A protein has these predicted regions:
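Hydrophobic/aromatic beta-strand elements that line small-molecule binding cavities or substrate pockets
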Residues: 13, 46, 69-74, 96-104
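Short, highly charged C-terminal tails/helix-capping segments
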Residues: 44-45, 151-165
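Hydrophobic ligand-binding cavity/cleft-lining segments
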Residues: 1-43
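Glycine-rich portal/gate segments that line the openings of hydrophobic small-molecule binding cavities
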Residues: 43-87
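Beta-strand/loop substructures that line and gate deep hydrophobic ligand-binding cavities in soluble
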Residues: 88-140, 163-164
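A short, structured loop/turn motif at beta-sheet edges
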Residues: 19-20, 49, 74-80, 101-110
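Hydrophobic pocket/interface hotspot
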Residues: 22-23, 32, 56, 73, ...
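Short glycine/serine/proline-enriched coil/turn segments at secondary-structure junctions
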Residues: 63-65, 90-94, 148
Length: 165
């Protein structure tokens, strides 16, 4: 699809664990199924091949409907940087690019998350329509990641997530 615009979401979070543990939570299917686009109680599939060119897949079932998220790894530099694509083919063939960068702190680590988001647009949209769609998509995406990162923090720092779906 050629008719799209992009917006970039950047979020920073601190964790009271070493960067290696956060990095592993992005790649270990047993960890992924508890927080990454899914919850333990709703996850159907969590699999990946964590190498450059390898793919990942999550299938989450909510209200009787399956939601599939897939992507491909571009860069894996443990425990500092991870870059991969993300798309949900049932909604769009457009792929976003996600980069996760980790930095050790005196206590724990800092994660910087960046997602280049592709937003489809209609032929007859005005600049105002495009801007509105970009803002709504950016803000909705940020809200979704905020919930996921709260779960990730709880999982890494306590060993479990209290809300499992």
């Amino acid at each position: 699809m050629d008719n799209y615009s992009t917006t970039t979401l950047t979020m920073t979070r601190n964790f009271d664990v070493a960067s290696k543990r956060v990095f592993d939570a992005w790649l270990n299917p047993e960890m992924m199924r508890k927080w990454f686009f899914t919850l333990e109680g709703t996850n159907q599939v969590a699999q990946n091949n964590p190498q450059v060119g390898g793919t990942w897949e999550i299938i989450d079932r909510r209200d009787g409907k399956d939601y599939r998220a897939i992507g491909e790894y571009f860069e894996i530099d443990p425990p500092k940087k991870l870059t991969f694509t993300f798309k949900m083919p049932q909604f769009s063939e457009l792929e976003d690019t996600i980069t996760v960068e980790l930095k050790e702190l005196e206590q724990g680590c800092e994660m910087t998350f960046t997602q280049v988001i592709h937003v489809e647009q209609e032929e007859d949209w005005t600049e105002s329509d495009i801007e509105k769609a970009l803002v709504e998509t950016h803000d909705g995406t940020e809200q979704g990641w905020n919930y996921m990162f709260m779960g990730l923090k709880e999982l890494l720092e306590t060993g479990k997530i209290s809300y499992t779906g």
